[in-house]
Amino acid sequence: HGLDAITGVGEAEGVRSVVVLGYRGVQALDVVGPCDVFTAATGVLRGQGREDGYAVSVVSRGGAPIATGTGLELAARPLPDPRRPVDTLVLPGGFGVDEARSDPELIGWLRLAAEHARRTVSVCTGAFLAAQAGLVDGCAVTTHWAFADRLAAEFASVTVDPNPIFVRSSDRVWTAAGVTAGIDLALALVEDDVGTDVAQTIARWLVMYLRRPGGQTQFAAPQLRSPLGISPGQYRKTFA
């Protein structure tokens, strides 16, 4: 089904196309986490004798291999026609996000693709891509706690809340907090699409909460320090 998301998005009846945007320096878990949730959902649904599910494709400029920030290289397909309907467009974060959002052609593709997507989802600093494309003007969003102040400073029209694990920013846009929060959001989207039983089955398989208790400030506190014991400024310098 992966090819369906490129050559004919959503052509298989009942299958929801998921297109994940990759770029140099993307955070690997921001890509792989949601992909694992959506593909697991398809497996659960097949086990129930259902034909619906998700067709997941990772795409990049020119279909070039994606060098992630952790050194893993991901295979990718070329960017699909942005005018073709997509169910879910996923915008991951990573230390390469500034380079990606400074690419006017990529942002132009993103803006048009989002117009034809049922929903657009950002993970971690992928919120900067969404903001750069004007997808969250006047909306409340979240991002990785260490980058919330920077996002708010750069995009005055966006209200940034550093606490939630994810936010439904508008009727068509969702934003998730840092890194693993993309898994939480993907589970919520699956639950919204096909029900709690499927989402709960996936959560058990992944050995995680279906609904994580608390927000992300519990991981930043006290004094907004990162898990590595460094300040947000040092964190950004190291990982952004």
Residue ranges of predicted features:
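Conserved anion/nucleotide-ligand pocket segment
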Residues: 164-203
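Extended, subdomain-level signal for the structured scaffold at the beginning of enzyme domains
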Residues: 1-120, 129-132, 191, 200, ...
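Flexible, glycine/proline-enriched loop segments at strand-loop-helix junctions
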Residues: 96-99, 136-139, 173-177, 188-189
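Membrane-embedded alpha-helical core segments of multi-pass
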Residues: 90-91, 159, 181-182
